[in-house]
Curated annotation (Swiss-Prot):
One Pfam family recorded for the sequence: Lact_bio_phlase
First-tier enzyme category under EC: transferase
UniProt protein name: D-galactosyl-beta-1->4-L-rhamnose phosphorylase
UniProt keyword list: Carbohydrate metabolism, Glycosyltransferase, Rhamnose metabolism, Transferase
Domain of life from the UniProt record: Bacteria
Family, as annotated: Belongs to the glycoside hydrolase 112 family.
InterPro entries found in the cross-reference section: Class_I_gatase-like (IPR029062), Ig-like_fold (IPR013783), Lact_bio_phlase-like_N (IPR035080), Lacto-N-biose_phosphorylase (IPR012711), LBP_C (IPR035356), LBP_M (IPR035363)
EC number: 2.4.1.247
Amino acid sequence: MEQQKEITKGGFTLPGEAGFEKLTLELANRWGADVIRDSDGTELSDDILNAGYGIYSTICLIRDHNAWAKANIDKLQQTFLVTSPVVANSETLTIDLMEGFFKEQFLVNDSEEALEYWQVYDRTTETLLQKESWSYHPQNQTVVLTGICPWHKYTVSFMAYRIWEEISMYNHTTNNWNKEHLMQIDPIHKETQEYLLTWMDDWCKKHEQTTVVRFTSMFYNFVWMWGSNEKNRYLFSDWASYDFTVSPHALKLFEEEYGYVLTAEDFIHQGKFHVTHMPADKHKLDWMEFINNFVVDFGKKLIDIVHNYGKLAYVFYDDSWVGVEPYHKNFEKFGFDGLIKCVFSGFEVRLCAGVKVNTHELRLHPYLFPVGLGGAPTFMEGGNPTLDAKNYWISVRRALLREPIDRIGLGGYLHLVEDFPDFTDYIEKIANEFRRIKELHNAGKPMALKPRIAVLHSWGSLRSWTLSGHFHETYMHDLIHINESLSGLPFDVKFINFEDINQGALEEVDVVINAGIMGSAWTGGQAWEDQEIIERLTRFVYEGKAFIGVNEPSALTGYDTLYRMAHVLGVDMDLGDRVSHGRYSFTEEPVEELEFAECGPKAKRNIYLTDGLAKVLKEENGIPVMTSYEFGRGRGIYLASYEHSIKNARTLLNIILYAAGESFHQEGITNNVYTECAYYEKDKILVMINNSNTLQESSVTIKGRTYTKDIPAFDTVILPLE
């Protein structure tokens, strides 16, 4: 890596481990750590604590309190569960509540206050059965239905305690731990709050050497329901779901504040639950607001205690983060000093960087565990953690060039690296590389190209950059691929919702992207009923801007076209009611810079040209998969799908430039699709990166002068320009 100076200290958090003091301090020196942390399952010895480093101590507020939890079972966290539909073959039916659920995670709550919220539904007619039609039998945890309709389907929605904290449960089963299962307590109860305030104060007294308290995270985990059948172990998982925040007491408090009663069905939603990928209704939004207000109000009291002891408070933007909402206006009320995000991908870097907090820190992958999240070997025989680290780093690095991050680090069991010296060498390299990139941002933002981008969906800025979880959890959605590509492209990007459009958000952007399937939160669903949205977007494009639609953009049934923006896109999708209508023929007119080298758009059946004027840039089996439509002075672009790759990121860049009427060949863009660059104008520093596993020659023009470099595999070149 070419550079003016080497920065070898600071901005790095190392996971220490008692019993491996020599290794801990040796790697702290090599990796330039200024902070040492503990991890789930590890401790720091006095030798480490007294070695002169800052100390991060990890706390999970709602677990590690088993003695108190066992004495206060009614204060455990809960959730609504729903049985699988069962078909009745007579007028009576017995349903086993826990069939299919992981019994080490859930325990039926059949208390009087919980039973008040249980519901039994006829799913054939979607009608609620009166309580006189069913009875609960606690001895075998079954519900017996009587006087029902044979051959109809029935479900029971009930409340259950969660008796094994999910993150600990995952770590326990992954690492073959042999220790007590940790329960999770619910601070919605006054008694729990009093206990936690006292515990937090005592904890701070006992941890004098801790400089930063790392909250993991606040109170409520993302939903992660496990099943008893290993063929379908994870029944339901949604990183941004609020399902694990419910309890009879919380529901009563909600009723008092909002003036109406929430039911089990408000959460169960026909067994579909309210996944983040679908637009939220008013009841869900009210519940989210209620929980967010509580988490902020009580969370601040705990953070104030930490501050009173002269310590900093950081929050981990994963695990039990639900209700924290770092992109909500309430977040700054917490008083957090920093935020830590676990990252696999570039979009997660941008997710972290955009939060209003003093310190932004990334927890890099791979974690120092024997196996990775997918169960593949990592720090064990058959694993290649160095290659894993390189592949993760090239995704992270391209986003790091666009927005500043203050710190990076690792987590897990440090002793596992002893058998992988090439891994320790590589971490030393990227730690130094990170520090240099961090320094470049101090002088100002890198150069950005002209089109300003707005990604339009139902959640808007609240879900900036993310959908619901990591890339491998949301890969089936076009938008996460778009976000990942955008994370390292030289554009200013913002995320807006439909109300933002009515408030004038289009005045600040040049290109709007809407991507996803019909009815999803990512395309907007019923939001497209608002004629003012249509009017504003139509005028926006007509007056010279661009609308890029991917998959089923603006789709909503009930109108003359399925795509509400079909008049701007020049294409629409037929659901069958136009099967007898004629279709315009066309000739493919490819544009070299817009061709996909790999993983191109996949054809969707029944896409047709609305008036025959759209230019078909790419077709597949006679179906348009990428089109361009001139509308007034602007342009609509349609893509049947989008999949992120290094090459495709360049194609997306070109599509955006083309949509905005900008040149493909301009300064600040490398000539090699495997490479990218960032130019920091104030310091006149050019950074060129190689996103491939082979040597690449790359050229880029800055201020009229072209610079050409050979960049080794995975590597970075930093050039001071005269």
